Amino acid sequence: MAKEDVIEIEGKVVETMPNAMFTVELENGHQILATVSGKIRKNYIRILVGDKVTVEMSPYDLTRGRITYRFK
């Protein structure tokens, strides 16, 4: 997947699930299932309920995403 094809949007973590999966509510009100990107996992960045995050989504599947940044 080319970098130009991703959609970046901000959201808020609503629920944590097993296997580093999260339910994220986007700014537009939709809820998606998101997983943690490799760099966040490698650097042991903790993501908790209520955190504001940036999510990358593929234009082909708008129900799933990848968390790429956690705001402080």
From Swiss-Prot:
This is Translation initiation factor IF-1. It comes from the Bacteria. It is found in: Cytoplasm. Pfam families: eIF-1a. InterPro entries: NA-bd_OB-fold (IPR012340), RNA-binding_domain_S1_IF1 (IPR006196), S1_domain (IPR003029), TIF_IF1 (IPR004368). Keywords: Cytoplasm, Initiation factor, Protein biosynthesis, RNA-binding, rRNA-binding. Residues 1-72 form the S1-like domain. Belongs to the IF-1 family. Gene3D superfamilies: Nucleic acid-binding proteins (2.40.50.140). Component of the 30S ribosomal translation pre-initiation complex which assembles on the 30S ribosome in the order IF-2 and IF-3, IF-1 and N-formylmethionyl-tRNA(fMet); mRNA recruitment can occur at any time during PIC assembly. It comes from Streptococcus mutans serotype c (strain ATCC 700610 / UA159). GO terms for cellular component: cytosol. One of the essential components for the initiation of protein synthesis. Stabilizes the binding of IF-2 and IF-3 on the 30S subunit to which N-formylmethionyl-tRNA(fMet) subsequently binds. Helps modulate mRNA selection, yielding the 30S pre-initiation complex (PIC). Upon addition of the 50S ribosomal subunit IF-1, IF-2 and IF-3 are released leaving the mature 70S translation initiation complex. SMART domains: S1 (SM00316). GO terms for molecular function: ribosome binding; rRNA binding; translation initiation factor activity.
